[in-house]
Amino acid sequence: MESLRQKVKEDGVVIDEKILKVDGFLNHQIDAKLMHEVGKTFYEQFKDKGVTKILTIEASGIAPAIMASLHFDVPCLFAKKAKPSTLKDGFYSTDIHSFTKNKTSTVIVSEEFLNENDTVLIIDDFLANGDASLGLYDIAQQAKAKTVGIGIVVEKSFQDGRQRLEEAGLNVSSLCKVASLKGNQVTLLGENE
């Protein structure tokens, strides 16, 4: 997705050799037009898979996931990082470690909104070590839902997330693949690395 690749190159800020800040269009301020295009691209890639639900995790996964759900015309469900007082009945839960925040959170999804009749597309903002996507996949498995793929907005290809997801048998689609953040510069896969 060329517009996303260009945005990452122009507006992405390298924090260190493993962390890329994209607060200007994805993780804090959201470029709605770009996210609409992201959602449409995921729709084009997975439209024949019978998706009934988009699954993501709060907070940064919500923007691309909600845009995809508009194109699929299905609900967007996000895993919560805290159990709300309104959730009285059953829920699925799993522990997810955030690479960027270096923090482990227990995330939950109400059993009311995910079950064996669902066909799920998982969408997330970043792929680093794969923990968030694998955690969401675990929740889908607990619900006995079918997972048809993982849609990633920005993949850090120099980390092992894709490999871990593919080893789990998951179909991974990344719209922008970062090859390196060395030298305080964003190098995308396919560029002069």
Swiss-Prot record:
Query: What InterPro entries does its record include?
Result: PRibTrfase_dom, PRTase-like, Pur/Pyrimidine_PRTase, Xanthine_PRibTrfase
**UniProt keyword annotation of Thylakoid present:** no
The UniProt record lists the EC number as 2.4.2.22
Residues that span the membrane, as ranges: none
Q: Does the keyword Transferase apply?
A: yes
Q: Enumerate the residues binding 5-phospho-alpha-D-ribose 1-diphosphate.
A: 128-132
Listed GO CC annotations = cytoplasm
Q: Name one GO biological process term.
A: xanthine metabolic process
| Keywords, ordered alphabetically | Cytoplasm, Glycosyltransferase, Purine salvage, Transferase
Q: Can you say where in the cell this protein is located? A: Cytoplasm
Q: Listed GO molecular functions?
A: xanthine phosphoribosyltransferase activity
What is catalysed by this protein? XMP + diphosphate = xanthine + 5-phospho-alpha-D-ribose 1-diphosphate
Give start-end ranges for the coiled-coil region(s).
Answer: none
Question: Which residues are listed for xanthine binding in this entry?
Answer: 20, 27, 156
**CDD domains associated with the record:** PRTases_typeI
Pathways involved: Purine metabolism; XMP biosynthesis via salvage pathway; XMP from xanthine: step 1/1
**What does the similarity note say?**
Belongs to the purine/pyrimidine phosphoribosyltransferase family. Xpt subfamily.
This molecule's function is given as: Converts the preformed base xanthine, a product of nucleic acid breakdown, to xanthosine 5'-monophosphate (XMP), so it can be reused for RNA or DNA synthesis.
Assembly information from the UniProt record: Homodimer.
Q: What is this protein called?
A: Xanthine phosphoribosyltransferase
Q: What gene name is given for the protein in this entry?
A: xpt
